[in-house]
């Protein structure tokens, strides 16, 4: 096993290159302009446990979704043999690993070498229509998630390399733009397959043990860099309460010490009857982006970068909605999370 600094740096750069190639493949083959022109997507790589292993490519908030989605899949498919080489999983449900809203389809593929699960390649992209009460699957009148489109709670889209046609048919039949959606699905599948192939090649070249050791080393470095930066930030407890356009107040309390960056969002309004809620995972993603920008904005992001971050939310609040709360315009609320912590 090689664990010298040069080999580790090569593997780190190769992980980023794989994510970049996944991004390019999806952009070139997608059929929706929101993917190939707007670039409303993200790609990334996790280790076998679903911990983010590279900064990925695309929208930072999207990349922060991928590890959470994979971890939900690992929990759901925990039985021996439930995850096999060639499988591709799909989720879009914010209450089952999808994190954002139903338009954003997450695809994840396990990476095996010699029968051992060593990593995951994953992507997420906004799809133009996944059903629901309004064209485009987004409506300000939605009061529950069921009105916003088809829910996919982490299912196998590809099993052992073969398409699960029943799932494909269910997805496309529920869309007003089935041909475009199907094309985007295959673009996403091609993307994760390319990523998986590159990771397999990397692990074979340097050995599985070196590959896994390198990812663990990156995460430890990320943790060390973050904790060193924490010591340079102002310490203490900082609070902010800000009135919103509808008269409600959003509140945040941030406590910074040498060992922890604690964000407390528990004292906030109950979830809405409107589609402006966000999932707890979505709230965490926003806190992670802010935390990274404060501690180590110039270094690659991975699981270790966020070990010193703790986020407290209250279940049933707008920042930790319970199903089936509507969540279509989650991003408006998530941006407020970022702003609140930053201004605090």
Name the predicted role of every residue range.
Residues 14-38, 74, 78-79, 93-98:
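Short, basic/aromatic recognition patches
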Residues 26-38, 83-84, 179-182, 200-216, ...:
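Flexible, glycine/charged-enriched surface loops at secondary-structure junctions
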Residues 61, 65, 97-98, 171, ...:
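Hydrophobic core positions in small helical hairpin nucleic-acid-binding modules
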Residues 37-40, 103-106:
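Short, small/polar residue-rich loop motifs at catalytic or cofactor-binding pockets
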Residues 193, 197-270:
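Accessory "access/gating" subregions that flank catalytic or transport cores
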Residues 112-199:
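Mobile "lid/hinge" segments at catalytic clefts and subdomain interfaces of large enzymes
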Residues 104-114, 122, 254-256:
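A short, hydrophobic, proline-anchored segment that marks a local hinge/packing element in signaling
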Residues 59-73, 106-109, 121-158, 268-290:
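Extended active-site and interfacial segments that coordinate phosphate-rich ligands
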